[in-house]
Amino acid sequence: MEEVTLDKLATDVGTTVDRLVQQFAEAGMTKKAGDSVNEEEKQKLLAHLNRQHGGGGSSEPSKMTLKRKTKSTLSVGGGRDSKSVQVEVRKKRTYVKRSASEEQEREEQERLAQEKEAEEAKLREEEKQREEEQQRKEAEAKAKAEREKAEKEKAEKEKLRKEKEKERQKAEAEKRAAMTPEEREAADKAKADAEKLKRQQEEEARKKAEKEAEAQAEEARKLAEENAKRWEEEEQKRKQQEKEDVHFTTSSTAQEAEDAQDFDEERKSRKRGKKRRRKDEESDDTPRREKRRKGARRGSSLQQGFNKPAQPVERDVKIGETITVGELANRMAVKASDLIKTMMKMGEMVTINQILDQDTAALVVEELGHKPALVKDNALEEEVLSDRQEGGEEAPRAPVVTVMGHVDHGKTSLLDYIRKAKVASGEAGGITQHIGAYHVETGHGMVTFLDTPGHAAFTSMRARGAGATDVVILVVAADDGVMPQTKEAVQHAKAAGVPLVVAINKMDKEGADPDRVKNELSQLEVIPEDWGGDVQFIPLSAHTGEGIDELLEAILLQSEVLDLRAEKTGMASGIVVESRLDRGRGPVATVLVQRGLLKQGDVVLCGLEYGRIRAMRDETGKEIKEAGPSIPVEILGLSGVPQAGDEATVVRDERKAREVANYRQGKYRDVKLAKQQKAKLENMFADMAEGDVAELNIVLKSDVQGSLEAISDALTKLSTDEVKVNIIGSGVGGITETDISLASASNAIVVGFNVRAEAAARKLVEQESVDLRYYSVIYDLIDEVKAAMSGMLQPEFKQQIIGLAEVRDVFKSPKIGAIAGCMVTEGVVKRSAPIRVLRDNVVIYEGELESLRRFKDDVQEVRNGMECGIGVKNYNDVKEGDQIEVFETIQIERTL
């Protein structure tokens, strides 16, 4: 036993040696400085100090006071003079802890009381059983007597009925013997009709009784469901109130006492309120109306004014071409959350602001029991466009030719020579600044030319499906060869499906080499006719006029093959080639008339704009009064600047044209949100139809020709039988607006290798939502394209065994059926996993686990070496010695 000196102990406990000696003396031990103190003496001193300071027992308090304070607000008065008063309720309770002996005595009394109560309950139960037995015997005797009496009465009635029937048959036989054969036949027929009528009446009465019984049963069932629902709500409300009841202590005894005191106070307050009301009613001899102040307002009635409909309300829901989920819910008078739940059950995950198409909205409306009324949002637009005077029979029209090519290859000079007018000299640096549209009367017929700066307008028209161009003339300088814009022109023409005529210009120069041009264009799959292809190559010189006639003949030959026809009378329609805001004349649009006759004063609906034509000018600036098919004209008088590619249509009524234009402007945003989603690498496979070859369209731009060829070759080799890589456009240099327009129109992605997009191209990317990606490592580019192609492949699934259990014994369960007592020998067994039952290593059943237990507890999984009980869904033929194989189906991600 460890001993310490008195000095050391005083230092440890933080007191003086003299004070410690005095405390030892009070405890009955004599000590002085320097003496040693053992463990037993320490315990004696500690016990003495506890008794001296009142801590002989537990340190818990014997009395506890709880205070509770609640605050609420009470509105006093009515009308404008009402005010709020803060009400504070304070409660104070004191709980006294019983001593151990009192607690023991109380528990003994409770035990005796419980035993006495159990004995009394047993006696009451026995007495009740004796009374029930006596009542049962009396009831049986009474029932037996009544049964015998009823049987006796029934026998007497049957005997009397037989006697009456015998007498009736005898009288009927006598009467029948006295009848003639005709009377006998009529009597038999009347008897048969009477029996048939009686059977029909009995059948109708039976059906009516069955219907009434079914109606009563249905009403009783509905009432039972309503009562059950109400009882469940009341029970939940009561549980919620109990849950919200706040106690100041965790002791169950204190909580019971607190609840009992609350109940007593509530009961007393209810009694006081009843007495006060009764006293007021007894003393109130005069009508309450007379006691009110004159002019005081009468209290409002609490009666509900809404009557529940007797049957579900079926509504006619009007659905436009697009409608949001929230608006559809409002039209059906249902909550948006309920509508979203319904669509989730139908397999559609939507939000409240998501736009639905007309077909989907109609299915949802029918699912909720309403009638969809499909409304065309553009009904007014169709009415305006249908109320037009169409022309008569079609007649041949002039071809519309678009001239394309690289900068400074002589496009405008070629047109200039054809028109015999020097237009190029007036333009900056001889480069076309805007779209020029000209029609030329030649000795071979009329031809309309579109001279484009680049290819933006042509791509825009192709993207809108305008089809304004009939033939493309590709101008290539014989001394310069194929250049980047030349390649872009070929790509645009092929994407639009427009026939191509190649004009090899500048043949009068010394360095002209037409064979080089043919070789370079053949690499772009533009094969000359003399090489076995289908493209006409015309060598010419815009400076000397050499080959111009051959070019015009080639154009007219191509137009004859296309058999171009249009109406030359009636209301005109066309397409906007270009538009601008002129400082002195306002919005000016160059319109190419495609059919009909356009006149000055006509009301034109042009995309989002409208207006009456105030003036018309041809390409030379000369004012004209009318223009027929394939004639380009400038028109003035529109409300705003239309977009290139918009359709221009002549209508009858200016007011309706304004309404249609305003509607289109309001609809523009909705259409932009609801239109088909652009191609993204993440969801490219969504556009792939089953069984078809998926195509990944790419517009590729690189910094140098070597990288471009290497990337193009690598991407093309990635194509498989299921996914095809289609490079629809490629080139060296920065990404331009033309590339973005081509990608937007062809549903492609734009890939840049060590190049960046121009500012205008970046703006167009945001507007058109085109997927634009930059790379600096060729392997990253190929890996991402390969990953996108892998996402477009059909998924593959594989079954993997995750556990094996051996059946040791079979038990019967009244709820589930046969329960297999198993030992898991391999892997893990999971609940609700698909399983196979094996007998002698042969699969005899395949299903899923319905129950998985371990020691009567439901578990989610059981691991190797553990016992468990397994219930197989819809299968009870499990025998000892069988094996249960648990597996799961996993999706294997396919790669190229």
Swiss-Prot record:
For this protein, the record's CDD domains field holds:
IF2_eIF5B, IF2_mtIF2_II, mtIF2_IVc
Listed Basic residues bias regions: 269-278
Region G5: list its residue ranges. Answer: 541-543
Residues the record lists as binding GTP: 405-412, 451-455, 505-508
Stretches for region G3 = 451-454
> Region annotation Disordered: residue ranges?
46-315
Please state where this protein is localized: Cytoplasm
Does the keyword Plastid feature in the UniProt annotation? Answer: no
Q: Which Pfam families match?
A: EF-G_D2, GTP_EFTU, GTP_EFTU_D2, IF-2, IF2_assoc, IF2_N
InterPro entries in the record:
DNA-bd_dom_put_sf, EF-G-like_DII, EFTu-like_2, IF2_assoc_dom_bac, IF2_II, IF2_N, P-loop_NTPase, Small_GTP-bd
Keywords, alphabetical: Cytoplasm, GTP-binding, Initiation factor, Nucleotide-binding, Protein biosynthesis
| Domain (tr-type G) ranges | 396-565
Which molecular function term from Gene Ontology is one that the record holds? translation initiation factor activity
Region of interest (G4), residue spans: 505-508
UniProt feature, compositional bias: Basic and acidic residues: 99-247, 279-288
Q: What is the documented function of this protein? A: One of the essential components for the initiation of protein synthesis. Protects formylmethionyl-tRNA from spontaneous hydrolysis and promotes its binding to the 30S ribosomal subunits. Also involved in the hydrolysis of GTP during the formation of the 70S ribosomal complex.
Q: In its UniProt entry, what is this protein called? A: Translation initiation factor IF-2
Instruction: State the species of origin.
Output: Idiomarina loihiensis (strain ATCC BAA-735 / DSM 15497 / L2-TR)
Read off the lineage from the record. Bacteria, Pseudomonadati, Pseudomonadota, Gammaproteobacteria, Alteromonadales
State which gene encodes it: infB
